[in-house]
Amino acid sequence: MAIHLYKTSTPSTRNRAVDSQVKSNPRNNLIYGQHRCGKGRNARGIITAGHRGGGHKRLYRKIDFRRNEKDIYGRIVTIEYDPNRNAYICLIHYGDGEKRYILHPRGAIIGDTIVSGTEVPIKMGNALPLTDMPLGTAIHNIEITLGKGGQLARAAGAVAKLIAKEGKSATLKLPSGEVRLISKNCSATVGQVGNVGVNQKSLGRAGSKCWLGKRPVVRGVVMNPVDHPHGGGEGRAPIGRKKPTTPWGYPALGRRSRKRNKYSDNLILRRRSK
């Protein structure tokens, strides 16, 4: 990914560093409008996810996470920007006339061919079951439930690694560092998700952040006591507690937030690294 730096003509562009713009001209039959209601609120109107609201209107692109066009070769026609994710997407024209969007694999260019199915070549962008992949293969868009579509390793630059196969399960090392078991019959896509340098971007100004639907972040210590447990006091006061807490009074910074007794506890061999 090429990073574009602006001339320092204004304060807004002085610290701005964005990727070279990939145009977006989506197909009408692969998009639909979505009503982004709530903006971080639940059904009762209470804030459950902070710092969200506003933002530009978006059209949702239908992404093929299942890759169920078996043994039919497709050609990459375009590489487009998707406002709903930080990874790019590719428009695929299949041999039977079907047209679908998929996540852009790193290194894929316009004109490359891809295919999904069993016993297909181990090539970047191809999708096949884990049982047909050799150990050490870099993969993304991994299924958890057979036939449901890829749910793991879908963000920009994400990549997992197949490290073992035993019995009916395969052992994967996920981008978070977690090591877990998944059925060998589940499918995944070979390669890494594109747009690897997304973390090198710098929006440079608050207005660009608002376009993305992200509101300003305010520290709890500068709020009033009615708004946050850290708030209140005369001048710059400490939080007044032994440990920092969330706005709802729960312990923050280090406490495990994963629910207990989940079905997948037995499938996780090693917790994710912090």
Curated annotation (Swiss-Prot):
Region called Disordered, residue ranges: 1-23, 224-274
Domain of life of the native organism: Eukaryota
GO biological process, one term: mitochondrial translation
GO cellular component: chloroplast; mitochondrial large ribosomal subunit
Classification via Pfam families: Ribosomal_L2, Ribosomal_L2_C
Keywords: Chloroplast, Plastid, Ribonucleoprotein, Ribosomal protein
GO molecular function, one term: rRNA binding
Compartmental location: Plastid, Chloroplast
SMART domains per the UniProt record, alphabetical: Ribosomal_L2, Ribosomal_L2_C
Subunit structure: Part of the 50S ribosomal subunit.
Family indicated by similarity: Belongs to the universal ribosomal protein uL2 family.
PANTHER family attached to this UniProt entry: LARGE RIBOSOMAL SUBUNIT PROTEIN UL2M, RIBOSOMAL PROTEIN L2
Name under which the protein is recorded: Large ribosomal subunit protein uL2cz/uL2cy
Taxonomic lineage of the native organism: Eukaryota, Viridiplantae, Streptophyta, Embryophyta, Tracheophyta
